[in-house]
Swiss-Prot record:
Location of Phosphoserine modifications: 136
Biased composition (Low complexity): 113-128
Gly residues bias locations: 177-186
Region (Disordered): 57-80, 98-191
Localization in the cell: Cytoplasm; Nucleus; Cell projection, Cilium membrane; Cell projection, Rhabdomere
Protein name (record): Protein king tubby
One Gene Ontology term, aspect cellular component: rhabdomere
Length: 443
């Protein structure tokens, strides 16, 4: 009997003390055996991970449910993977929406009127810091877009103070103090006639045009080429569109198209007014009208040349710029100068040869160093509110109190631009665009 029981227990059909079991063939035709990795019967639940009666103990490893461990581990891995994916998505979104800020965008300390007077008297007794005009190249770069480069050396120019009313003194309204133009109170200009003709017409004497430039960073090609819009400011917050400008994509040097049609900023558009073109280093810019370079009937005319002083030594200081304009006739019209005409010289060639008969040379007004704010300051009479390396005022050496043009920042993407005789809107807007462009060898 005992031998029979031992033989029976040794038969393949019985439960063995192992998880490897060779099952008995179910039929004679199926001679291949099957492997069962489990216990057969109630004993299965004792060793099974899914034992419903199992008591889990935190102290012993054997009391931890393997399924719970695997589930917890998988859940933790999934949460970690999800967190990593979210972090990568946030990083990509941050990079895609990230906009390079100006290095010079720093808090502005507004000087009160009595402090401004005291600072002015103190600065008048001290020697003013000289203008460093270096004519060489450096690798300091500019900021504005992903395609543009970053300024490293130019110091921001801060507004010197807020006047009770803009352009109240001789600097801007020509009131008689011995230095102004003697025009008395100036009137604010308005658009006369068609836009395309108005933007090319020199400003009348005694008229001031207050404008605003808005920078659209989205622009074209995912923000690599911002679009700039020029509006004439009117009362009660109203504004009139004048010009739009954008940088051309496929150009060896910086090349801006300027148009009076905001919906079509192309060279073939009906509203095409002119263009701004720079040299390789971004130190010299030439403004042209919409004339044809090859045409003899309506040749392309030079409207202005903007030259930024180069700086190889990295001196900290505001930008130094020179603007050369065509001279004015007795009836307040521009002298026609064309570098495309082989019979005459362009504005830049005339300036290099010191032939100043038919051209006018302007310079940016030298800012004054303020020891209290530790910055360069200019009085923009409330029109500029933020420090920026782009802030400037253009004057003529013979009359430094007559501000031909001023440009400066009021917010991250909004700038004010005011101009008067002898500039036109096209010239002033192009000068402002040159300030936005990257400059390899400046600052």
């Amino acid at each position: 009997m005992e031998a029979y029981i031992r033989q029976k227990r040794a038969s393949p059909g019985m439960v063995q003390a192992s998880d490897l079991q060779i099952n008995r063939p179910m039929s004679g035709m199926r001679s291949n055996s099957r492997e069962l990795h489990a216990y057969d019967g109630p004993m299965q639940f004792i060793s099974s991970p899914q034992n419903p009666d199992q008591i889990l103990t935190n102290g012993s490893p054997g009391g931890i449910n393997p399924v719970a461990m695997n589930t917890s581990r998988n859940h933790s891995n999934n949460m970690r993977s999800l967190s990593t994916i979210n972090q990568e998505a946030d990083l990509i979104e941050e990079i895609s929406s990230h906009e390079l800020e100006d290095e010079e965008s720093s808090p502005v300390t507004v000087i009160e009127q009595h402090q401004q007077s005291a600072s002015h008297s103190a600065n008048s007794t001290q020697s003013q810091k000289p203008r460093a005009r270096q004519h060489s190249f450096s690798d300091n770069l500019d900021e504005d877009d992903y395609t543009n480069r970053n300024v490293a050396g130019a110091a921001p120019v801060r507004p010197a103070g807020m006047a009770s009313s803009p352009y109240k003194d001789a600097t801007l309204d020509g009131s008689s103090n011995g230095t102004g133009n003697g025009t008395g109170g100036e009137s604010e200009g308005d658009v006369i006639g068609n836009i395309d003709q108005f933007v090319m017409q020199p400003a009348p004497q005694g008229v001031l045009y207050k404008c605003r430039i808005t920078r659209d960073r989205k622009g074209m090609d995912r923000g690599l080429f911002p679009i700039y819009y020029l509006h004439l400011e009117r009362d009660y917050g109203k504004k009139i569109f004048l010009l739009g400008g954008r940088k051309r994509k496929k150009s060896k040097t910086s090349n801006y198209i300027v148009s009076c049609d905001p919906t079509d900023l192309s060279r073939n558009a009906d509203g095409f007014c002119g263009k701004l073109r720079s040299n390789v280093f971004g130190t010299s810019f030439t403004v042209f009208d919409n004339g044809n370079k090859e045409s003899t009937e309506s040749p392309r005319l030079d409207l202005a040349v903007i030259i930024y002083d180069t700086n190889i030594l990295g001196f900290k200081g505001p930008r130094n710029m020179t603007v050369i304009l065509p001279g004015m006739t007795e009836d307040d019209q521009r002298v026609k100068i064309s570098s495309a005409d082989p019979k005459q010289q362009g504005i830049l060639d005339l300036w290099k040869m010191k032939n100043m008969d038919n051209i006018v040379e302007l310079h940016n007004k030298t800012p004054v160093w303020n020891d209290e704010t530790q910055s360069y300051v200019l009085n923009f009479h409330g029109r500029v509110t933020q420090a920026s390396v782009k802030n400037f005022q253009l004057v003529h050496d013979s009359d430094p109190e007559y501000i031909v043009m001023q440009f400066g920042r009021t917010s991250e993407d909004v700038f004010t631009m005011d101009y008067r005789y002898p500039l036109c809107a096209m010239q002033a807007f192009a000068i402002a665009l040159s300030s936005f462009d990257g400059k390899i060898a400046c600052e």
